[in-house]
């Protein structure tokens, strides 16, 4: 309804965006519907679930660390303005929050940093693709956008919405809405925000900074939204988890078994008349089989484990995955049941990884510049 008030229908620029983001988010969390499978044991189908290395989440975290880390510096020619902006960023935990947001930008393709004033105190919101609706854009130059967020309160929950709409002659107008509901109701109640419901900024400086992944969204080349770094590597993620699950099954199914006649697995009577089992019935190493006229003797079975072959297969899948997401070949190393960053990797200025990092840095630099302009405009900081 709020979008209709502004003259827009929901997500008019990309109707499939929400569906894609939810799919990417499922893979980021780790286990999806694709991790469920069934095995028939001769009597019935048994439901099973693949184990997961959560490689999508780990790769997004490692990619984010290339950009928002302790080496990041913001330099402004006017040192007075620089100090004030740096103070605001530090008070809002910018480095940590931006790093967390960047992880989700890599996972979901899009993010936004939104500075605003709360009783004349500068605050910053960090929103991922699930909370962003782009309303008007020229490629990735966003003019109109809506942000929304749901937060829990002591009495229930609170829905906040703010839309940034550009008038080509007057500048930006920001429309704010707040809705609340308590734990006993299902519908939200609109709160009266007074003059804050419509803020005419009289400025053409947007009070938001957009973040994207550098790759074109090949699911919709006209979409203004970014693409998950692993959007084209989902089959590889599933392949990684299948091999990882096979490693666990190899150990589990390859355990030694001792097959004993069922009469040998029964009980003897001791001197006190108590029944005592010949073999511990809870010991899964023993398996009772029918006795064929006393001819069946104890038999033992054991299998050679294929740990080395499966480890090599997992490493090959990891190499394929890291090449697809921008970390380069052989970035991860699987050892002792864990995934480690390969410290032997050396990044050259002529490598694919380096070039992809520079493309992402260009997008981040532009967003930080826009953020600094927005903060300076909000705080009415004057200077070049």
Stretch-by-stretch model annotation:
Residues 23, 29, 36, 45, ...:
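Hydrophobic alpha-helical segments and helix-packing faces
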């Amino acid at each position: 309804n709020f979008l209709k008030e502004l003259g827009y229908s929901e997500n008019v620029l990309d109707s499939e965006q929400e569906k894609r983001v939810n799919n990417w988010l499922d893979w980021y969390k780790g286990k999806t519907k694709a991790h469920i499978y069934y095995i028939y044991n001769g009597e019935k189908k048994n439901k099973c679930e693949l184990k997961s290395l959560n490689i999508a989440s780990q790769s997004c975290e490692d990619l984010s660390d290339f950009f928002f880390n302790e080496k990041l510096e913001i330099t402004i020619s006017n040192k007075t303005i620089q100090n004030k902006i740096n103070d605001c960023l530090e008070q809002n935990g910018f480095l940590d929050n931006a790093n967390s947001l960047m992880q989700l930008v890599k996972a979901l393709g899009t993010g936004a940093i939104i500075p605003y004033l709360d009783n004349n105190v500068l605050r910053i919101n960090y929103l991922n693709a699930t909370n962003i609706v782009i309303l008007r854009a020229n490629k990735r130059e966003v003019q109109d956008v809506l942000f929304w967020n749901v937060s829990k309160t002591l009495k229930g929950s609170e829905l906040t919405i703010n839309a940034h709409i550009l008038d080509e002659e007057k500048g930006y107008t920001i429309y704010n809405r707040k809705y609340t509901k308590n734990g006993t109701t299902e519908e939200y109640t609109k709160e009266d925000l007074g003059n804050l419901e419509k803020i005419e900024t009289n400025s053409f400086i947007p009070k938001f900074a957009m973040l994207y992944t550098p790759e074109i969204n090949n699911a919709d080349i006209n979409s203004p939204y970014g693409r998950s770094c692993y959007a084209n590597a989902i089959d590889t993620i599933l392949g990684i988890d299948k091999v990882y699950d096979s490693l666990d099954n190899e150990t589990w199914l390859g355990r030694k078994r001792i097959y004993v006649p069922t009469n040998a697995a029964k009980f003897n009577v001791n001197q006190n008349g108590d029944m005592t089992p010949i073999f511990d019935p809870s010991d899964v190493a023993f398996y009772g089989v029918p006795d064929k006229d006393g001819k069946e003797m104890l038999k033992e079975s054991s299998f050679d484990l294929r740990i080395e072959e499966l480890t090599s297969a997992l490493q090959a899948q990891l190499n394929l995955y890291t090449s697809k997401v921008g970390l380069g070949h052989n970035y991860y190393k699987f050892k002792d049941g864990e995934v480690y960053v390969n410290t032997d990797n050396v990044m050259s200025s002529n490598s694919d990884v380096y070039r992809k990092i520079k493309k992402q840095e260009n997008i981040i630099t532009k967003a930080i510049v826009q953020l600094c302009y927005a903060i300076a405009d909000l705080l009415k900081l004057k200077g070049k």
